[in-house]
Amino acid sequence: MQQQSNIRNFAIIAHIDHGKSTLADRLIEYCNALEAREMCQQVLDSMDIEKERGITIKAQTVRLVYKADDGCVYHLNLMDTPGHVDFAYEVSRSLAACESSLLVVDASQGVEAQTLANLYQAVDNNHKILIVLNKIDLPAANPQQVQQQIEDVIGIDASDALMISAKIGLGIKDVLQAIVTKLPSPNGDSQSQLKALLIDSWYDSYLGVVILVRVVDGKIEKGMRIRMCSNNAVYTVENVGFFSPKKQISGVLYTGEIGFVTAAIKQVADCRVGDTITDDKKPCAQILPGFKPNLPVVFCGLYPSDASQFNHLKDSLQKLRLNDASFEFEQESSGALGFGFRCGFLGLLHLEIIQERLEREFDLDMITTAPSVMYKVYLNTGKVIDVHNPADLPEMQKIKSMSEPWVEATIFIPDQYLGAILGLCTEKRGVQVDLTYVNGRAKLVYLLPLNEIVFDFYDKLKSYSKGYASFDWQIDSYKQSDLIKLSILVNGNPVDALSTIVHRSKAEFRGRELCKRLKDLIPAHLFQIAIQAAIGSRIIARETIRALRKDVLAKCYGGDITRKRKLLEKQKAGKKRMRNIGNVEIPQSAFIAALKITNKD
């Protein structure tokens, strides 16, 4: 049993690409947690997609054993967290399990938007912050300026910040020494009843559900009967252990320790993240506060390209949800695309990752509809409904008003790109809240509609700033807006998969662009096809695909003009009848390309 005073629990937080996972690699290497032949880049990033993109998606935990200069042996529980805003829920779970944080800042880039967002979360959790300036070996590194920037922007003392280069291993011992001397040991009563925080859960095909826990009071050991406080489910503990980063069975976890527990739990849904785990016979008097679950903010439809793959898609989504409880899905059907699922995500990167995992791990070919957000619709009857699928929107005459979610966005940009970014925010209906300057960089705070962000805001932001802008957002509130449903009609029939909810000021432009795009994508038929964009019953844009013409006079070699006229009249009547009863085949490529309209508008 390790003395409680010799345990340190800490998370590594930083902006994307500032070197969190590389620092974790060096700490693991220095503590000899893995043999040299087992070391590789981003050891804790286990998914192929994480290694390929160079990002962390799932927060990972590892226990390191470090012998300090004072001769004592310390157990360091390290949690590597994601940097992207979409995976902020992973960060919040890790921070709730720790007492302190290493704030890693790139010495060449300085404070970025995610640096601030993650730091504020750590401060909310009453963490002791240890500042680490990484990449000091780069020619562009300016540690003194970044120290000043940290003090100016964040307001915390950076005079004793640690100078390191995680890539070449410079200053790693200083980091470990600072962890054991400056960071606090965990609080908690080892003699009290068991009280543990459920940090994460995932599914293992052999062990069932594996749960990651932080023991706050008491201890958890093999054979113990434990109870989940949220649903009073009782389980018998089968295995207890920790990651080093390999799985190690210890049989018991004491106060202040972080590790995994298996107890023949069948479904991840039974293990609510943030739940309190206690002893079934001697339950704790008060449960832990936990943390609020993240609600999905971006929604889209996923449909199999081949209708016969529907059940395979359903099974794949259920399997993915076992390891990622943050995304939701429900069955829906579309007249144009058949049966599929309406899915909710934490952001566009989250959507992209789930889509890529479905295609790669489950070999699925899918159609993704345009992303949308959750709107609040106030009906004339006084009832309020939530709508994220345009097909579910009631008729406009039944609606009193509509509200859309707005976000508070923080943007860091070099001075020379400020004008272009201010123009972009205004174009996206933004409202400026704050503008400050720190060391040649501008910090912008804007209120923006989430509907404008989920399409192409991030791409344009990077394009206008030549890649130098950093961006973070959080939901602010719902605000009333002049929103309408834009319907696309092909030959007078609405195509539900192409309907969108847009602001009235952008409806005409969006409608015209969609009609033009569809005209190029839908193949010509033997009859004329009208493509129309409509708001309610009012047509705002139209394009016409001309009919293919069969030469019915080819077999007439001379003869009376009435013979030719008779054949032409017959063709004309046939086309008229075909226009009334003929179905327009819209290829799937047309849906996919038309839904990308927003990337270029």
From Swiss-Prot:
Pfam families in UniProt: EFG_C, GTP_EFTU, GTP_EFTU_D2, LepA_C
Claim: 4Fe-4S is one of the keywords in the record: no
Domain tr-type G: 5-187
Topology of this chain in the membrane: Peripheral membrane protein
Listed EC numbers: 3.6.5.n1
Cellular compartments annotated: Cell inner membrane
Gene Ontology MF, one: guanosine tetraphosphate binding
Binding-site list for GTP: D17, H18, G19, K20, S21, T22, N134, K135, I136, D137
Keywords for this protein: Cell inner membrane, Cell membrane, GTP-binding, Hydrolase, Membrane, Nucleotide-binding, Protein biosynthesis
Cellular component GO terms, alphabetical: plasma membrane
Gene Ontology BP annotations: positive regulation of translation
Similarity comment: family membership: Belongs to the TRAFAC class translation factor GTPase superfamily. Classic translation factor GTPase family. LepA subfamily.
NCBIfam families from the UniProt entry: lepA, small_GTP
Function of the protein: Required for accurate and efficient protein synthesis under certain stress conditions. May act as a fidelity factor of the translation reaction, by catalyzing a one-codon backward translocation of tRNAs on improperly translocated ribosomes. Back-translocation proceeds from a post-translocation (POST) complex to a pre-translocation (PRE) complex, thus giving elongation factor G a second chance to translocate the tRNAs correctly. Binds to ribosomes in a GTP-dependent manner.
Classification via PANTHER family: TRANSLATION FACTOR GUF1 HOMOLOG, CHLOROPLASTIC, TRANSLATION FACTOR GUF1-RELATED
Protein name: Elongation factor 4
